[in-house]
Regions:
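Short regulatory helix/loop adjacent to the ATP-binding pocket of P-loop NTPases
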Residues: 124-140, 153-156
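A cross-kingdom feature that marks ATP-driven nucleic-acid transaction machinery
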Residues: 14-22, 29, 38-45, 272-452
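Conserved lysine of the Walker
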Residues: 32
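N-terminal pre-Walker A segment at the start of P-loop NTPase domains
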Residues: 1-15
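Interdomain hinge/linker elements that couple catalytic modules in large macromolecular machines
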Residues: 153-336, 343-346, 353-361
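Conserved catalytic segments around the Walker B and adjacent sensor/switch elements
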Residues: 42-56
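Structural recognition of the conserved hydrophobic beta-strand(s) that form the central parallel beta-sheet
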Residues: 90, 115-121, 142
Length: 452
């Protein structure tokens, strides 16, 4: 069991005045249960209830009062109700009993002294059906696959992890850190895979873990959807959709399958609710407001880059490749950057963004946009040295921003670039391993100088 940076948020939540029950939102196998058990070591009493177990679900399914429910929970755990002891109650797989979801409001209203965390692996797909969380009585935290920093921590490299977080990796360690980031691209961030690699350092052995996790995702299809046609479409996506990671897709023509656009679209949206993937729709203007154009083709980003590489058989090629731009036209590098950008926030509902211009005689696409204060910052992922940034330049011609970012394999550098009819902007070339901490860079390294 290795530490996760998200445990810092759990500590902040526990110390907060007016604390509400916390609902962990995240895909299957991102480490929700393990994180809570790690956090539980900081409490006097820990009660864990997995509602997939019938006897635990029955505690909530009866029509007893909340006081009787609470008494039953403590009785079953064989621990006394002692208000002098810090007690953490963990309700896992809460989606298995809707009444358990409703009980969260009473924990907030009647027993705010108790620390309550709920989680469920299929929570997202079921949210749109029969489960409704009590409004204003719970708060949420998103949990994603391990970030590069957490990967380093799992390998026992805490000092290097701190340097990556602080944007302070010494120049002498640049190549070494880049090599570790490539390992992270291959292994990915699913905790069970990371733990296996940290223990054995074996790329072959982690394949067995990937295969087991993938089988679990596929076996859950019947839980994701009830209609046979939608189940078939979901199975097809889980079998073949990984090869389109980082690509813009069209439902009507997805991998030349026989599924109708509506069926493919519904299947993708169902998988999106489970947080196994995200359909990222483009921004078409270079300024606020942020309004993704749902009429345009979305970009497909999967939960984990390591899983993508395993399914499509790219691990060996990536291992011996010096430039990620050579693989999939750079899609793998772009995909792992997207994963790092999402992992940088624990706020649920964060959406990644990219920009396109689809004019008849002028097409362009910037890999990502991030919001920093009142600014919309473009990011291009171009790991090679001799690469053009035509799309980024087109974005900056339409934008009033003074800063653009390029993530690459090289060292930290910057260029001042002229633009027609306006003042120049600064292009910062940033090592790709800093992808999850760009807000730190923008705040600490640029500050008022760039945005003044």
């Amino acid at each position: 069991m290795f530490s996760r940076t998200s445990i810092k948020y759990l500590r902040q939540w526990a110390a907060k005045e007016g604390r509400k029950p916390l609902v962990l939102r995240g895909a299957r196998q991102v480490g929700k249960t393990t994180l809570v058990r790690l956090f539980a070591q900081e409490f006097d009493t820990f009660i864990s209830l997995n509602l997939e177990e019938k006897e635990n679900a029955e505690l909530f399914s009866s029509d007893n009062s909340f006081e009787d429910l609470l008494a039953a929970i403590f009785f079953k755990a064989n621990v006394p109700q002692d208000s002098t002891r810090r007690t953490l109650i963990f309700i896992d797989e809460i989606q298995c009993e809707p009444k358990a979801v409703q009980s969260l409001r009473y924990f907030y209203e009647k027993r705010p002294d108790l620390y309550v965390i709920a989680a469920g692996s299929l929570l997202e797909s079921l949210m749109g059906r029969h489960i409704s969380f009590p409004v204003g009585r719970v708060e949420y935290m998103a949990l994603h696959p391990c970030t590069f920093v957490e990967f380093l921590m799992a390998l026992g490299m805490d000092e290097l992890a701190r340097q990556v977080e602080d944007f302070s990796v010494p120049a002498s360690l640049h190549t070494y850190t880049l090599g570790l980031f490539k390992k992270y691209m291959i292994v990915g961030g699913l905790p069970e895979v990371v733990s296996c690699f940290a223990q054995y350092g074996d790329y072959v052995r982690i394949g067995d873990v990937f295969n087991s996790l993938l089988s679990g995702y596929r076996d859950d299809v019947e839980k994701y959807a009830s209609k046979p046609k939608e189940q078939d479409a979901i199975r097809y996506i889980l079998n073949y959709g990984w090869a389109f990671a980082g690509h813009r897709i069209q439902f009507a023509k997805f991998t030349n399958s026989d599924f109708k656009a509506a069926d493919a679209g519904n299947a993708f949206r169902t998988l999106e609710k489970t947080l196994l993937l995200e359909l990222v729709y483009p921004q078409v203007t270079a300024s606020f407001p942020i309004l993704p154009d749902l009429r345009k083709s979305p970009k497909l980003l999967w939960l984990d880059t390591g899983m993508v590489n395993y399914v499509v058989g790219m691990q060996e090629e990536l291992l011996f490749c010096n430039d990620a731009d050579e693989l999939w036209n750079g899609d793998i590098a772009e995909h792992v950057v997207g994963q790092e950008l999402l992992g940088a926030s624990l706020a649920f509902g964060e959406k990644r963004m990219f920009w396109v211009r689809d004019a008849k005689n002028s097409q362009a696409e910037v890999d990502f946009l991030i919001r920093f204060r009142a600014h919309l910052i473009p990011i291009e992922v171009k790991t090679g040295v001799n690469t053009r940034l035509r799309s980024l330049h087109q974005f900056m011609e339409e934008s009033k921003e003074k800063v653009a970012l390029r993530l690459w394999n090289g060292p930290m550098t910057s260029d001042t670039i002229a633009r027609s009819g306006g003042e120049p902007f600064t292009l910062y070339n940033i090592p790709i391993y800093y992808a999850g901490h760009l807000h730190v860079f923008l705040q600490r390294k640029i500050g008022g100088m760039a945005f003044g």
